From Swiss-Prot:
Keywords: Aspartyl protease, ATP-binding, Cytoplasm, DNA integration, DNA recombination, DNA-binding, DNA-directed DNA polymerase, Endonuclease, Hydrolase, Magnesium, Metal-binding, Multifunctional enzyme, Nuclease, Nucleotide-binding, Nucleotidyltransferase, Nucleus, Phosphoprotein, Protease, RNA-binding, RNA-directed DNA polymerase, Transferase, Transposable element, Transposition, Viral release from host cell, Virion maturation, Zinc, Zinc-finger. Retrotransposons are mobile genetic entities that are able to replicate via an RNA intermediate and a reverse transcription step. In contrast to retroviruses, retrotransposons are non-infectious, lack an envelope and remain intracellular. Ty1 retrotransposons belong to the copia elements (pseudoviridae). Residues 660-835 form the Integrase catalytic domain. Initially, virus-like particles (VLPs) are composed of the structural unprocessed proteins Gag and Gag-Pol, and also contain the host initiator methionine tRNA (tRNA(i)-Met) which serves as a primer for minus-strand DNA synthesis, and a dimer of genomic Ty RNA. Processing of the polyproteins occurs within the particle and proceeds by an ordered pathway, called maturation. First, the protease (PR) is released by autocatalytic cleavage of the Gag-Pol polyprotein yielding capsid protein p45 and a Pol-p154 precursor protein. It catalyses: DNA(n) + a 2'-deoxyribonucleoside 5'-triphosphate = DNA(n+1) + diphosphate; Endonucleolytic cleavage to 5'-phosphomonoester. This is Transposon Ty1-DR1 Gag-Pol polyprotein. The lineage of its organism: Eukaryota, Fungi, Dikarya, Ascomycota, Saccharomycotina. The active site is at residue 461. The C-terminal RNA-binding region of CA is sufficient for all its nucleocapsid-like chaperone activities. Residues 583-640 are annotated as: Integrase-type zinc finger-like. The record marks 401-402, 582-583, 1217-1218 as: Cleavage. Capsid protein (CA) is the structural component of the virus-like particle (VLP), forming the shell that encapsulates the retrotransposons dimeric RNA genome. The particles are assembled from trimer-clustered units and there are holes in the capsid shells that allow for the diffusion of macromolecules. CA also has nucleocapsid-like chaperone activity, promoting primer tRNA(i)-Met annealing to the multipartite primer-binding site (PBS), dimerization of Ty1 RNA and initiation of reverse transcription. Residues 1038-1053 have a biased composition (Basic and acidic residues). A motif (Bipartite nuclear localization signal) lies at residues 1178-1212.
Length: 1755
């Protein structure tokens, strides 16, 4: 398109709304956020220059060839008539209109059409009417054509030779979302700048550079309206336009303001993250800068807390300030203000040293007068990693001058820490360090002044054998008179003042010490490289650092002059003054026992108590002087801080008067502690303590319960002990008012022995302080011991006993004696004591064989009470032994190292202390005794039964599924045990080995598939799958025939079920052995096709689904086709839309990708769509998938015996496979106790109703003659085993009535008082559902009855006694039971036998064989559930006759007679049933769920969007370790039990569509992670949203002569952890769903066929039992069928080949299945996967599929 000549009119029109363009981007690196006025001018200049330089000819275009850019259209092309285009394109300037022409009379008049403003539109000629604006000076919107001869001059640029060009401007993109508006504005502003309109863009202050004209405003409005549709504008933009829809300038101004604000925030964050400070600027300025940035960010809503701010500041510190990183990095609560205080202090100290530093520049003549001598004349011997670097130093040595005065100079630490310095740092002179510079390579210069000292540094000397220092400021543990002679290189003596330790604290936060000599008679402080090498520190002159042998950098080395120096800032200062010189020679003192070791040895007692004990010889073997007390004052034991944390101290000295009034052992204090929960049955849950008032001697005894007889046994024992051992009689025992002390049994015992019980008074908390404080102290010690040792919690009483032994031997600060001394006993010999939990090896005197190891790892607990041995805990044997045959395990690790409070190991100290007890290894030194290994006298410690709680500490690795090494061959157990202080696994069952720990995050149940090649044989594939486990030799022969077998699959299965795409058929595991599947001839195939009974050889078309059946056995009486149609006809299968035969759905459309993440399972497999591939050619060993925990003594190693976890939290492994069933679910407690219902009930009306119910229950008990009222028995005359506690419980029934029940405490009933073989039977839910279904089909009347106080009609055979009810006022008496009281173990069985006998003998009923509590006669069927009876009969009079007979013997109430033909509502065993005879029956629980679900504290959303499915595919449960506090864990487990308990109750009643989710979540009850809880909440929410759903049954057609019982089966292969499969079955009677089951397969299946066979085999037994029940209740013939969507399963069942199967588990199930099918006249048919309603039992389904499969039978 040719450009026309422009006239000299002041206005130039343009044919496009986006007029001036350049093909060259302007400032591509320009920040789009920066839109200030200065930048806008730059854009204008750049755009002008670009436009002036670009020329095109009329026949060419400057637009680059780009398919995404629209090219100018010729004039002949008509304009498009469609709307605006969102595509980006290049715009071209059109032919100019006459000068001064403007279509608009006013900017507010916008007569344009949308398509004309489209970026894709280019008008053909000058007649086109477009918005235009006048061109002015400084805004070159266009350029004149060459024909005009005129030149348009721009005042803002010097270019006057502009030629005719065609300019193209890239328009802004279309705005598509309000959230994208900020980014869109940036591109829009850039578009205006490229269009030479930068001057009208508002600046930061909101004003443009120049005024905008009306035409420019119109152009602005039009372009903004086109590219920013109103529906995508933010709210604040719409608010501006609502006031003035043309005020685009205000929108741009506010947008620029927002961009500037965002830019400032980003700059502040970048500045804060890149802070740098080295002291070169004042600290005040640095603080002001940082605080201003933080304040601005906080004001803008970006909160920077103290921790983050301090980390950013410290990261930027360098030079002398860098040291703050290592002193402040542990302060968790440090503030910015505190950090700046340190920075100011260093800065002021630095400035002060600079101002006060004298001039050290030497006169050159001083060098000539220097007559100092050197310590040696050899070259420095430097220990370096690069030996060649050593030669770089000159032949100068460190000098120790024998001068009378020391040349002490002020020292400063100015070196910088550099880990990668490659050249030695050299300084001109020592003054360079005081010029405010860092000691870096930038300050390094070479100098000839090599003999000057570098202040504040130590000279590294390879020739010096000892380290010498002039100042005593850094000497630790200094001692005078060292008796050491030191000479210099000239053999002259150097007097030594003292010897001590020089302690270093290097930059890696490690501490090291070496010996140092103090003398003021040397010129330099010398650091011996030889002594550094002795502590594993070398000088590396390649890197110029001090480092360890492993390469850890400790400190930099500075080269100053000709020598190498290290800074003194790594020295730890000491306040100990060094004595004056004394040359008297004394030998070095012997090594003392470190205080931390003694502190741990003596049960973590405090230093004062230990010193008193050593002074008074209550602890023997060594004296007070043998302990190093230097660290005792400031020493903090982290184990004590954790274990003994307390609120405040108790009042001391409050009981001195009692100590003066009584003799020893006459006044005792006692108290009981407990219970301790979550312990095995063999471990005690309580302990009772006794303390003598005078001597403070303590005793502790374990208790398993607080029964009266247990307490009495302890009192008898301690009184006899005191009487026989101390010849004393106890006069007074002080105790609290607990029931264990106030009971009559103990009171009489004390009265009989002449002992006065002294009880505490009300609100007197101090009166019982002695016993309470002792229990608290022992408990503190217990926690500390368990924390320090890492032993499991079930050994808690051993820690209590160890602490008691030690504390009886420690002196009291007041009495100056120990309790043992007061009692006249000898002091405790500490050489016989071991630290609690000390690892030892115990000799096995009776091994299993001669080659069995003789040593058993164990842990020392405490000295034995009954021998001279020691109680040792043996984790591998789960028991404790009393033995002297042990040796202490040596090593270098310490439990204390994780707290970094001491780097010492105490092996040598422990060896010296217990030297006399280390001799059992040398058998020739001692004589072995036959009784050295004695079982402990404590029953609770022997044969410990570990609690099945989750372990506190877990092993970190699990077996990879691709690991070819069996778990038993792991080499962890082959490591030599040689570590001391090795931690025992906290709460870890010693049976758990590292190889059988369950699921790991890395473990995958999906095998990796490689080299998949299609064979072209109907979807068969060849897979190369890595082995999951080594295959035994016996399997080789079987696998050799793998290639001959086939797995026939149906090709058109529905999306998420088994297809030949999801489960790739493979030759070994996907199908059967070739000898098992019969060969089918062509004739047989043809015959089957003719009879429309397709075989598994050919897949029938999907639209012929009604004939997709394979009958297994054809009875002679019914044709095959009729049987098929009869069974499938009435089933509630989904109606599928018809499909065209020519349309083939994409089989991969809805399949999720196969990846390892699916194996972690959502809800244990939710999200699986059977997209798992079977294993090729070699089978996986079933032993590798066992989830049972096996005993393994070889798992004792150094790894799993350490526990570094804090005591407040536990890590729990996801042991999903350990949960066998939902049996552990605790029901929700709906009953109230007496105090809840009556005593403390604030609801007066409810309280009155409960009182009325209470009296009604008492009257009923008396009426039923429940107990013998003729005689009352004294409690002491009756065997306590036969005494049963009782209580009242209250509840509100569903009908609103209030009920009270007097029950016995059967949970604590002694086993000798009942026959464990008796069974309490109730009607099975399947029997009830079967009876209801038959009642609907046969128009039966349903009558509901209730027998009041049913159990009280049954006599009791055993001799049992109970305490009378409280209202009788006979607490000291017992009454004998005559009737079966509710709560007793035998009451249910007694009632069952009673009512069974009555129904059979008096009512003429008989019990159906195999179905307890189902009785029938010729007219009536009865279902019995405890005291509820459901009667079914076609004649209502027959029911009434039974009722009349029952009323003769029992108090029978008619709940619902069931007469009438209208809809009748029942509440039968929790089911809300609506029944209209001969029409329908609806089963639901809407009222019950509406009442119960809100009480679960689940955040329900009653008005929100309802969930349409209980779960969705693709959700996976993480199986990472769960770290959670113990209390929170118990709370969440209890919450899960409540939620899953209620869901399980509802699911098994009638919501069979939820059973898969319920079963899977039930496996995670002991793993209550946030994800599991959320999924559980989602399930409860779905139950709430669908609480009105009902199980719908319709009456069967009366023309049907037979009853049809069908089981539909399905399996989801390998979608559970550890290759387990989920199986499900749904049972239907006459087309009505009566039950369902979803569970995890007990065996690990290796193919989909095995899983399907497992599912069918699980359904057959129950199908046969139901068949027997139906035939007993209804005499019609019955047809039994089993439907499955697995053709290979049908083929195996049909086959008569009895060759050996692939494995015995698979073969056994298949053979049993064949026998059951053939022997029970059972039909097996194929059902399309799309119609298989059992799919909902095995996997989560999409919403559409879920509704399709369930809406026919539950809605």
């Amino acid at each position: 398109m040719e450009s026309q000549q422009l006239s000299n009119y002041p206005h130039i029109s343009h044919g496009s709304a986006c007029a001036s363009v350049t093909s060259k981007e302007v400032h591509t690196n320009q920040d789009p956020l920066d839109v200030s006025a200065s930048k806008i001018q730059e854009y204008d200049k750049a755009s002008t220059k670009a436009n002036s330089q670009q020329t095109t000819t009329p026949a060419s275009s400057a637009v680059p060839e780009n398919p995404h850019h629209a090219s100018p259209q010729p004039a002949s092309v008509p304009p498009p008539q469609n709307g605006p285009y969102p595509q980006q394109c290049m715009m071209t300037q059109n032919q100019a209109n006459p000068s001064g022409w403007s279509f608009y009379g006013h900017p507010s008049m916008i007569p344009y059409t949308p398509y004309q403003m489209s970026p894709m539109y280019f008008p053909p000629g000058p007649q086109s009417q477009f918005p235009q604006y006048p061109s002015s000076v400084g805004t070159p919107l266009s350029t004149p054509s060459p024909e005009s001869g005129n030149t348009f001059t721009d005042s803002s640029s010097a270019d006057s030779d502009m030629t005719s060009t065609k300019k193209y401007v890239r328009p802004p993109p279309m705005l598509t979302s309000p959230n994208d508006f900020p980014n869109w504005v940036k591109t829009y502003i850039k578009f205006l700048q490229n269009s030479n309109l930068g001057g009208i863009i508002p600046t930061v202050n909101g004003k443009p550079v120049r005024q905008i004209t009306d035409d420019e405003l119109t152009f602005l409005y039009n372009t903004f309206q086109i590219f920013a549709p109103s529906q995508f504008l933010p709210t604040w933009v719409k608010d501006i336009l609502s006031v003035d829809y043309t005020d685009i300038m205000k929108i741009l101004s506010k947008s620029i303001e927002k961009m500037q604000s965002d830019t400032q925030e980003a700059n502040d964050i970048v500045t804060l993250a890149n802070l740098q400070y080295n002291g070169s600027t004042p600290a005040d300025a640095f603080e002001t800068k940082v605080t201003n940035i933080i304040d601005r960010l906080n004001n803008n809503g970006i909160h920077i807390n103290n921790k983050v701010a301090c980390q950013l500041i410290m990261r930027g510190l360098s030079g002398e300030y860098k040291f703050l990183r290592y002193t402040r990095h542990r302060h968790l609560n440090m503030t910015v203000a505190e950090l700046f205080l340190d920075i100011h202090a260093i800065y002021e100290e630095q400035q002060g040293s600079r101002n006060s530093k004298p001039n050290y520049r030497r006169n050159p003549s001083d060098e000539k007068n220097d007559s100092r001598s050197y310590t040696n004349t050899t070259k420095p011997k430097v220990i370096a990693r690069n030996p060649q670097k050593t030669n770089n130093s000159k032949s100068k040595t460190a000098r120790a001058h024998n001068v009378s005065t020391s040349n002490n100079s002020p020292s400063t630490d100015n070196d910088s820490i550099s880990k990668s310095t490659t050249e030695p740092i050299q300084l001109n002179n020592k003054h360079d360090l005081h010029l405010g510079q860092e000691l870096t390579e930038s300050t390094v210069n070479h100098t000839n002044h090599s003999d000057d000292e570098l202040p504040g540094h130590l000279l590294l000397d390879s020739g010096a054998s000892r380290t010498l220092i002039r100042s005593a400021h850094h000497i630790h543990s200094a001692s005078s008179n060292p008796g050491i002679n030191v000479v210099d290189a000239q053999k002259r003596n150097i007097p030594i003042n003292a010897i001590g330790d020089l302690q270093f604290h290097f930059q890696d936060n490690t501490k090291t010490s070496i010996k140092v000599l103090h003398t003021p008679n040397i010129a330099y402080d010398l650091l011996s490289l030889n002594e550094l090498a002795a502590v594993d520190i070398t000088a590396c002159f390649t890197k110029n650092v001090l480092e360890r042998s492993d390469g850890t950098v400790l400190a930099p080395i500075v080269k100053y002059g000709d020598f190498y120096w290290v800074s003194k800032k790594y020295l730890l200062p000491s306040n100990i003054s060094v004595p004056t010189i004394n040359n008297v020679h004394t030998s070095e003192s012997t090594r003392k026992y470190p205080y931390p070791f003694i502190h741990r040895m003596l049960a973590h007692a405090n230093a004062q108590t230990i010193r008193y004990s050593l002074k008074n010889n209550t602890i023997t073997y060594f004296n007070e002087s043998d302990v190093d007390w230097s660290s005792a004052i400031d020493y903090q034991c982290p184990d004590c801080l954790i274990g003994k944390s307390t609120k405040h101290r108790h009042i001391k000295g409050s009981r001195l008067k009692y100590q003066n009034s009584y003799e020893p052992f006459q006044y005792l204090h006692t108290d009981i502690f407990g219970p301790v929960h979550n312990l095995p049955n063999s471990a005690p849950s309580y302990f009772i303590s006794f303390t003598d008032e005078t001597t403070k001697f303590r005793w502790v005894y374990p208790l398993h319960d607080r029964r009266e007889d247990s307490i009495l046994d302890v009192f008898t024992t301690i009184l006899a002990f005191i009487k026989n051992q101390f010849q004393a009689s106890v006069l007074v025992i002080q105790m609290d008012r607990g029931s264990e002390y106030t009971n009559r049994t103990l009171h009489k015992f004390l009265e009989k022995n002449g002992i006065t019980p002294c009880y505490t008074t009300t609100a007197d908390s101090r009166a019982h302080g002695v016993a309470e404080r002792l229990n608290r102290t022992l408990l503190d010690d217990c926690r500390t011991q368990l924390q320090c040792s890492g032993l499991p919690n079930h050994l808690w009483f051993s820690a209590i006993e160890f602490s008691t032994i030690v504390r009886n031997s420690l002196a009291s600060p007041k009495s100056k004696k120990s309790a043992r001394q007061h009692a006249g006993l000898a002091g405790l010999d500490i050489s016989t004591l071991l630290p609690f939990g000390q690892p030892v090896i115990v000799n096995d005197h009776n091994p299993n064989s001669k080659i069995h190891p003789r040593g058993i790892p164990g842990y020392a607990l405490h000295p034995s009470r009954n021998s001279y041995g020691y109680i040792i805990y043996l984790p591998s044997l789960k028991k404790t032994v009393d033995t002297t045959n042990y040796v202490i395990l040596q090593g270098k690790e310490s439990r204390l190292d994780q707290f970094n409070y001491d780097a010492l190991t105490f092996d040598e100290d422990l060896n010296r202390l217990t030297a006399s007890y280390h001799s059992f290894i040398a058998s020739n030194e001692i004589q072995e005794s036959n009784d050295l290994n004695i079982e402990s006298d404590h029953d609770f410690q022997s044969d410990i039964e570990l609690h099945p709680e989750q372990p506190r500490n877990v092993l970190s690795k699990a077996v990879s599924p691709t690991d070819s090494t069996p778990p038993s061959t792991h080499t962890e157990d082959s490591k030599r045990v040689s570590k001391t202080n090795i931690r025992a696994p906290r709460e870890v069952d010693p049976n758990i080995s590292e190889s059988n720990i369950l699921p790991s995050k890395k473990r995958s149940s999906t095998p990796q598939i490689s080299n998949i090649e299609s064979t072209g044989s109907g979807g068969m594939h060849k897979l190369n799958v890595p082995l999951l486990a080594p295959m035994s030799q016996s399997n080789t022969h079987e696998s050799s025939h793998a290639s001959k077998s086939k797995d026939f699959r149906h090709s058109d299965s529905y999306s998420e079920n088994e297809t030949n795409h999801t489960n790739v058929p493979i030759s070994s595991t996907g199908g059967t052995n070739n000898k098992t599947v019969p060969q089918i001839s062509d004739q047989e195939t043809e015959k089957r096709i003719i009879h429309r009974s397709p075989s598994i050889d050919a897949s029938p078309p999907e639209n012929n689904s009604s004939h997709n059946i394979v009958p297994i056995k054809t009875p002679t009486t019914v044709s095959e086709q009729n049987t098929e149609e009869s069974i499938i006809a009435d089933l509630p299968l989904p109606d599928l839309p018809p499909e065209s035969p020519t349309e083939f759905p994409d089989p991969f459309k809805e399949l999720p990708p196969i990846n390892s993440h699916q194996t972690n399972s959502s809800l244990g497999g939710i999200g699986d769509s059977n997209a798992y591939t079977t294993i090729n050619s070699k089978k996986r060993s079933l032993e590798d998938n066992e989830t049972e925990i096996k005993v393994s003594r070889d798992t004792w190693n150094t790894k799993n015996m350490r526990s570094l976890e804090p005591p407040r939290s536990k890590k729990r492994i996801h042991l999903i496979a350990a949960v066998k069933a939902v049996k552990s679910i605790k029901p929700i407690r709906t009953t109230l106790r007496y105090d809840e219902a009556i005593t403390y009930n604030k609801d007066i009306k409810e309280k009155e109703k409960y009182i009325e119910a209470y009296h009604k229950e008492v009257n009923q008990l008396l009426k039923m003659n429940t107990w013998d009222t003729d005689k009352y028995y004294d409690r002491k005359e009756i065997d306590p085993k036969r005494v049963i506690n009782s209580m009242f419980i209250f509840n509100r029934k569903r009908d609103g009535t209030h009920k009270a029940r007097f029950v016995a405490r059967g949970d604590i009933q002694h086993p000798d008082t009942y026959d464990s073989g008796m069974q309490s039977n109730t009607v099975h839910h399947y029997a009830l559902m079967t009876s209801l279904s038959l009642a609907l089909d046969n128009n039966y009347y349903i009558t509901q009855l209730d027998i009041s106080s049913a159990y009280l009609y049954a006599d009791i055979k055993e001799e049992l006694y109970i305490r009378p009810p409280p209202h009788l006022g006979m607490n000291d008496k017992l009454i004998r039971l005559k009737k079966s009281l509710y709560g007793l173990k035998q009451s249910g069985a007694n009632w069952y036998e009673t009512i069974k006998s009555y129904l059979i003998k008096q009512c003429g009923m008989e019990e159906v064989r195999g179905w307890s509590c189902v009785f029938k006669n010729s007219q009536v069927t009865i279902c019995l559930f405890v005291d509820d009876m459901i009667l079914f009969s076609k004649d209502l009079n027959a029911n009434k006759k039974i009722i009349t007979t029952l009323k003769k013997q029992y108090d029978t109430k008619i709940i619902n007679l069931g007469e009438g033909d209208n809809e009748i509502q029942y509440d039968i065993l929790g089911l809300e049933i609506k029944y209209q005879r001969s029409k329908y029956m609806k089963l639901g629980m809407e009222k019950s769920l509406t009442e119960k679900l809100p009480k679960l504290n689940v955040p329900l959303n009653p008005k929100g969007k309802k969930l349409r499915a209980p779960g969705q595919p693709g959700h996976y449960i993480d199986q990472d370790e769960l770290e959670i506090d113990e209390d929170e864990y118990k709370e969440k487990v209890h919450e899960m039990q409540k939620l899953i308990g209620l869901a399980s109750y509802v699911g098994y009643k009638f919501r069979f569509d939820l059973l898969y989710y319920i079963n899977t979540l039930a496996q995670h009850i002991l793993f209550p992670s946030r994800q599991v809880l959320d999924m559980t909440y989602e399930l409860i929410q779905f139950m709430w949203d669908t609480r009105d759903k009902q199980l719908i049954w319709h009456k069967n057609k009366p023309t049907k002569p037979d009853n049809k019982l069908v089981a539909i089966s399905d399996a989801s292969y390998g979608n559970q952890p550890y290759y387990k499969s989920q199986i499900g079955n749904i049972f239907l009677l006459n087309g009505k769903v009566i039950g369902g089951k979803s569970t995890k397969a007990s065996l690990t299946c290796t193919s989909t066929t095995e899983a399907e066979i497992h599912a069918v085999s699980e359904a057959i037994p129950l199908l046969n039992n139901l068949s027997h029940l139906v035939q007993e209740l209804n005499k019609k013939p019955i047809i039994k069928g089993s439907l499955t969507d697995s053709r290979s399963t049908i083929s195996i069942i049909k086959s008569t080949n009895e060759e050996k199967f692939r494995n015995r588990f698979f073969g056994t199930k298949a053979m049993r299945l064949r026998d059951e099918v053939s022997g029970n006249n059972l039909y097996v048919y194929y059902i399309e996967t799309k119609k298989n309603i059992a799919d909902v039992m095995t996997k989560p389904l999409p919403i559409k599929t879920f509704k399709l499969l369930t809406n026919k039978w539950i809605h």
